[in-house]
Every structure is written in structure tokens, then in C-alpha cells.
Amino acid sequence: MDEKDRPKNLREEEEKPSEETKILISSLPWEIDYLGNKLFNYEGYWYSEDILQSIPNIHTGFQPQETDIILASFYKSGTTWLKALTFALVQRSKHSLEDHQHPLLHHNPHEIVPNLELDLYLKSSKPDLTKFLSSSSSSPRLFSTHMSLDPLQVPLKENLCKIVYVCRNVKDVMVSVWYFRQSKKITRAEDYSLEAIFESFCNGVTLHGPFWDHALSYWRGSLEDPKHFLFMRYEDLKAEPRTQVKRLAEFLDCPFTKEEEDSGSVDKILELCSLSNLRSVEINKTRTSSRVDFKSYFRKGQVGDWKSYMTPEMVDKIDMIIEEKLKGSGLKF
């Protein structure tokens, strides 16, 4: 990726919130989350004020193309890994997996794949999308989102594209959120606890939550339209990475050829995108963005890490809630 292609200053065309947006926000019920921030309930989900400003911008300005790929996830669910894997897959004809100048060796995955509601449409309905697009017109546009499927239905109604959702066990998500918040420059660890995060998740009052409704929106999408929706589990990616990466490639219409498989391309992608390799990239060790150290995106990535932190009472409570919320859906964690 050339320097000019880096996704800098994606919020150049800043627009103030419309009066309609201000009126909407003032009319919504709100709660205080575990960080003391005000979250507003809009059509069943909890959003911060800035995300609420981005939703109408996405509705009016985002025009999906059939070749677009949207990577969706609840935060701290494997987003960074999915971005790296997807970029390496769809760009492997342009960027050799053995190239020392591969973009993933010089840029954080979040720089390469911008977030719709935060990087692009937060302050504008007409962001400059050329800031991150590949110079190859045949390459798909890659976007990410932490929103549920529901607010995306408006732009997707006109032109549906490929959507990949990665879901992670909510107990591991909570622990990961806890540690990630400690890395934020504006957050003091003593200001909140795992117990506070746990209660917010149980009550459903978390940014983009409730967690189960978020996951179910994409789960149902994958059942109704498997051509356009792929539902992936973080735990499956960890347990069977080769199988899952090949599944992802098939879904994205860029399957591995026999020659690629014989030459070890699958393993090369997994190595390039591995937690240990990405963690060792210089920019991921030293760069800070939005008051977050890039290194904080690469902690453990373990499955079942929650067992070291949650009490039996916490586990019983969240398991009962999960069983109730997912009952009859076919979705299991």
C-alpha cells in the first residue's frame, strides 16, 4: 500500500449534527454505562451520541456496491484478526504473502479496513472513500462495523453486498473489554471493574448492545441469505484455522486454487495474520491512535480466558441469560 493510499483524515468533510438528529437524541431513553457514559436506546440498541450522528449519515450517504465486503462484529470479538485475514485473502494476487512490503507488515489492520460509523460517516454523509481504496479497480472495497445488522438494512436494501460476522463467547468478550479499557489513555483502571462490565452486559446496556440481539441479527441474516451473510465463530477460527480460512475464501469468491494449496498459501496467510506476527510489527508496537496503543489490539486472543476471572456465580448468571435470550434460535456459544 502506497503512502497516498493510507486511510488518513477520513473525516475531512465534517458536518454538524442536523437539527433532526439533535431532536431525535433528545427524545430517546438513556442509561449510564459502566464507564459513566450516557448511552441512548434507538430502535432496541444502545448507542453513544456520536454513533447516533453517524447512522443517518450512513443511511443517506453510504451506497454499497455488490463487490463490497463488510466485516461486522461486536467489539473485542476478533475484529482485528478478521480484518487482517480478509485483506490478505482478497489482496493476495496484488500483494505477495512473502513480500516484506506487504501492507499488513507496515500498517495496523484498523488503518487498512476503516469502520463505517467511526472512521467514515461519523461527521459526514459524503466522506472521501478514495483515501483507503486500492489502486486496483478490480479489488473489493473493505469496510467494518460494530453495529448490528438492523441499522444497516436501509443502505443494504438498495444493493446487498457480502457481510462477514465474527461472533465470540460473550464471557471472553467481557474480559477482553475489561483489559482493553485499561489501555485507553482516557480511562483509569480504578474507575471501573470487571463486575461493572459484567452487570452492564447482563442488563444489555452496552455500546451496540444488547450483545445477544446483536449476534442474533447477523445469525438470522446468515440463515435467510447464506449467499450474502457468513456467520463465523471466533472459537472455530482458533480451533480449525485452515478450514475456516478456506471457508472464508470460498464465501468471498476467491477460493484457493490447487496450486495455491500445494504451495502452502493457506498457511502463509495464517502466519502473516497470526497474533504473534502482527504483534511484532513495528507500528503495532509503537503507534497510538485515538488514545489507544496499537499493541492493545493484540493481547492473548485465547479461548476460555474468562475462566481465570469470573466467579461461579457470574458464570451461572450469564449462562442463564444466554440460554433465555438464544432459546429457539439455533445459535449457541
UniProtKB/Swiss-Prot annotation:
Which organs or tissues contain this protein? Answer: Expressed in roots.
Query: Record's InterPro entries?
Result: P-loop_NTPase, Sulfotransferase_dom
Query: What are the catalytic residues?
Result: 146
Indicate the principal place this protein occupies in or around the cell: cytoplasm
Q: Which GO terms describe its biological process?
A: brassinosteroid metabolic process; response to cytokinin
**Record keywords, A-Z:** Cytoplasm, Transferase
Q: Where on this chain does 3'-phosphoadenylyl sulfate bind?
A: 76-81, 168, 176, 234, 299-301
Name what induces it. Down-regulated by trans-zeatin.
The UniProt record lists the EC number as 2.8.2.-
Entries under SUPFAM superfamilies matching the protein: P-loop containing nucleoside triphosphate hydrolases
A single Gene Ontology MF term assigned here is: brassinosteroid sulfotransferase activity
Subcellular localization, as worded in the UniProt entry: Cytoplasm
EC main class here is: transferase
| A cellular-component GO term for this protein | cytoplasm
Q: Which residues form a coiled coil?
A: none
Q: What does this protein do?
A: Sulfotransferase that utilizes 3'-phospho-5'-adenylyl sulfate (PAPS) as sulfonate donor to specifically catalyze the sulfate conjugation of brassinosteroids, including castasterone (CS), brassinolide (BL), related 24-epimers, and the naturally occurring (22R, 23R)-28-homobrassinosteroids. No activity on phenolic acids, desulfo-glucosinolates, flavonoids, steroids, gibberellic acids, cytokinins, phenylpropanoids, hydroxyjasmonates and coumarins.
Q: Which family does it belong to?
A: Belongs to the sulfotransferase 1 family.
Q: Could you tell me what this protein is called?
A: Cytosolic sulfotransferase 10
